[in-house]
Every structure is written in structure tokens, then in C-alpha cells.
């Protein structure tokens, strides 16, 4: 709500001695909104400050899954590095999940263990961060081109055979003639 203070938005009605005694909460507040007055009304903040307050509110929560849309928008490089480190150490190994949509390639490399590319109604999974995704995608594209080249080569041979006219006694199956016409 625009009438809520930054503090109310981030920690709710938790007393200061409770949230301030939690090192994780203190680190999040210091990194993301340390320059924003704790008692400022959210409605008086700039768009970037509001985004950082919202991000702090999410990170303070104890979630098993986080879904973040462009989390690095309105963050400086130091804060982006902090966010990547925080997300990498947020959950114990093998627990927790992060779903992130971003154009920040460095951030993707830092926080992603796997990526999904969505295109033409298809979801292609890739292991690793952005750099690994690029390498794997190039290899998949190369393999797809090789398969298509072989298919086109076979099609050319079949069409050339049909153009010469199949001989009456040739044992070329009818299904191949039909397939070539399709």
C-alpha cells in the first residue's frame, strides 16, 4: 500500500528487536534499501526505490521458491553482485528453487544451474548458466542443420530418380515414390 512505511512493507509489524536480530534480514535491508528512510511512505518513493523495497520484502520472507522478474532493474553493480551471492547461498544445497526472467547475462551466469528457452511453443532445457546455454544452443543448432542437410540431400536424390522416370522393372517401392511426392 502507498500509505505503508518502508519498514511496514518489508518486515510487517514485527518489532525491531525481532527483525534486527536476524542477520539475513539486516543484510537484505542494508544491501537493498539502506539509503531509503525506514519510516518513509512507500507512495513517496521513486519507482526504483519501490522495486527495491518489494525485492527486500520478498527476500526477507522464508520462501522455498522465488520467482523474480527482472530483479536487477534499478540496482547498481555492487547490489547486483550482492543479490547474486545472496541467491546462491539462500538455500541449503539441494533445496529451494529460483525462477528468474532477466536480460542480465552476467546475472544468469552467476545464479542459474539450468535454463529453459521457450520458442515456437517448445521448451528446450539447457544445463548451466548463460554461457553454457549459448554453447549448448549452438551445438543443437549445428546438429539440427546437419540433420536437415541430410534430409535435403536424400530428397534431391529421390526427386532426381523420379525425374529420370522409374523403370518398369525397378524394384523401387511405391511408398518411396509417394513419399518423394509429399
Label the model's feature ranges:
Residues 14-20, 139-182:
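Flexible nucleotide-interacting loop at or near the entrance of a catalytic core
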Residues 1-148:
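ABC ATP-binding cassette signature C-motif
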Amino acid at each position: 500500500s502507498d500509505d505503508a512505511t518502508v519498514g511496514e512493507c518489508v518486515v510487517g509489524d514485527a518489532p525491531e528487536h525481532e527483525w534486527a536480530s536476524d542477520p539475513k534480514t539486516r543484510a537484505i535491508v542494508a544491501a537493498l534499501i539502506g539509503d531509503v528512510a525506514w519510516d518513509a511512505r512507500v507512495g513517496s518513493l521513486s519507482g526504483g526505490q519501490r522495486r527495491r523495497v518489494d525485492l527486500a520484502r520478498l527476500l526477507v520472507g522464508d520462501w522455498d521458491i522465488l520467482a523474480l522478474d527482472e530483479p536487477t532493474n534499478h540496482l547498481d553493480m555492487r547490489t547486483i553482485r550482492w543479490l547474486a551471492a545472496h541467491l546462491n547461498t539462500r538455500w541449503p544445497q539441494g533445496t529451494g528453487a529460483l525462477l528468474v526472467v532477466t536480460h542480465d547475462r552476467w546475472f544468469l551466469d552467476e545464479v542459474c544451474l539450468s535454463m529453459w528457452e521457450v520458442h515456437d511453443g517448445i521448451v528446450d532445457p539447457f544445463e548451466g548458466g548463460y554461457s553454457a546455454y549459448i554453447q549448448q544452443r549452438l551445438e543443437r543448432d549445428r546438429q539440427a542443420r546437419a540433420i536437415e542437410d541430410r534430409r535435403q540431400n536424400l530428397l534431391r536424390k529421390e526427386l532426381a530418380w523420379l525425374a529420370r522416370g522409374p523403370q518398369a522393372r525397378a524394384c523401387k517401392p511405391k511408398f518411396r515414390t509417394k513419399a518423394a511426392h509429399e
